[in-house]
Amino acid sequence: MSDQQLDPQALQQEENTLIALRKEKLAAGRAKGQAFPNDFRRDSYCNDLQKQYVDKTKEELAEAAIPVKVAGRIMLNRGSFMVIQDMTGRIQVYVNRKTLAEETLAEVKTWDLGDIIAAEGTLARSGKGDLYVEMTTVRLLTKSLRPLPDKHHGLTDTEQRYRQRYVDLIVNEDVRETFRVRSQVIAHIRSFLMKRDFLEVETPMLQTIPGGAAAKPFETHHNALDMEMFLRIAPELYLKRLVVGGFEKVFEINRNFRNEGVSTRHNPEFTMLEFYQAYADYEDNMDLTEELFRELAQLVLGTTDVPYGDKVFHFGEPFVRLSVFDSILKYNPDLTAADLQDVDKARAIAKKAGAKVLGFEGLGKLQVMIFEELVEHKLKQPHFITQYPFEVSPLARRNDENPSVTDRFELFIGGREIANAYSELNDAEDQAERFQAQVADKDAGDDEAMHYDADFVRALEYGMPPTAGEGIGIDRLVMLLTDSPSIRDVILFPHMRPQA
């Protein structure tokens, strides 16, 4: 009977039997005083050895007799040799019955896949050309009590992979590589900005007033202060306070929290880069963003052509720049400018498109609803969508030529928003009026409308220089660069419902 034909109860019973056997082996080790030693220090990593000695022949290695100390998890056990895995990769270790003590050979026979061992010996090469360690000593460091997934079928259940990411990382090299890339991306972003004189800062995660984005926050209670607080939805207002204070180039890479839906593109807890630079505008940020994205693609992929699913996104070409208004007309030739400029017609179009129209929305809000329903998913190649209506941009500076829109863009790639940026509103009186309008929208039923932040208005009253700011979703960016279909694939421990 195949594994697929076994019912879950039988599989669980088999696993329980294996766990019991492993616990017996651990008990025997404890009795000998040999359980979980912590006095071994390796001097080499598996993949480093593979790279360093790739050109050495069997004869050259035999003559050199290079001593090494390695450690790792047993991933394959063929009796005469084992394959161990560490954080860099894998290497074979040879069980030499001529050089290992009888007691050691007896212990090796009791070891299981998943056990973590330490090996000392010399490097050698097999007749097939594989590099290996000819062991002179080897011992068990950690007994694995749970069996690894079957090597033929692996860990294929998606939900189990997310719930037990530790197992996923052990058995799936491509998953480990995804998170190495994520680390690379964040490190390069940090370096990219610091080379341009940006200062990295940290701002509050717990806030008394959630601001900086249109989103529903998580609420909590501060017992000592006896007050309601919120997990931040964005760091924006604190970062702009720092610009007021004289830190003219700042950035933060950290978590945001939004009490909203979960999907392949959304996780309630996510990582965001936000940066602000004085004496710049949103067009400067477009140029900076293009440069950053090209560097990241080149770093990760070695090319500016980014494959994703059945598409290839071209980061090496200038990103398309198109206004919200013009993009609606471009991708919906049946609509006219007159349709979008009439509030009743725009409301009807938004409703027909499937938008949740509450009835109090102004023309600008309706235009954005139409854009989100009819255009957003069509923006496959990189697009900077600009000139968002001021009604939906309460923190952005109005456009000098058309005050009904703002100097703002959102970057879309693959039909997904990747970044949001604008020339910052630094007119304290205008900001106060927009906060008041947001409060009115919230009172009318808009859960995502912003609160009034009097302290932020006060900060602006001291004077903030002309500034441009931007937020980039790290998770979605990593999805693009690793060709990952779900945001859960690029978050180590995504949120899941508790198991029954």
Swiss-Prot record:
Gene Ontology cellular-component annotations: cytosol
Subcellular location(s) of the protein: Cytoplasm
PROSITE patterns in the cross-refs: AA_TRNA_LIGASE_II
Positions of Mg(2+) 2 binding: E417
EC numbers, comma separated: 6.1.1.6
GO biological process terms on file: lysyl-tRNA aminoacylation
GO terms assigned for molecular function: ATP binding; lysine-tRNA ligase activity; magnesium ion binding; tRNA binding
Cofactor dependence: Mg(2+)
Cross-referenced InterPro entries: Aa-tRNA-synt_II (IPR004364), aa-tRNA-synth_II (IPR006195), aa-tRNA-synth_II/BPL/LPL (IPR045864), Lys-tRNA-ligase_II (IPR002313), Lys-tRNA-ligase_II_N (IPR044136), Lys-tRNA-synth_II_C (IPR018149), NA-bd_OB-fold (IPR012340), NA-bd_OB_tRNA (IPR004365)
Binding site for Mg(2+) 1: E410, E417
Catalytic activity: tRNA(Lys) + L-lysine + ATP = L-lysyl-tRNA(Lys) + AMP + diphosphate
Record keywords: Aminoacyl-tRNA synthetase, ATP-binding, Cytoplasm, Ligase, Magnesium, Metal-binding, Nucleotide-binding, Protein biosynthesis
Enzyme class: ligase
Keyword ATP-binding among record annotations: yes
Cofactor-binding details, from the entry: Binds 3 Mg(2+) ions per subunit.
PANTHER family: LYSINE--TRNA LIGASE, CHLOROPLASTIC_MITOCHONDRIAL, LYSYL-TRNA SYNTHETASE
Subunit text: Homodimer.
Family: Belongs to the class-II aminoacyl-tRNA synthetase family.
Protein name: Lysine--tRNA ligase
Natural source organism: Pseudomonas savastanoi pv. phaseolicola (strain 1448A / Race 6) (Pseudomonas syringae pv. phaseolicola (strain 1448A / Race 6))
Gene that produces this protein: lysS
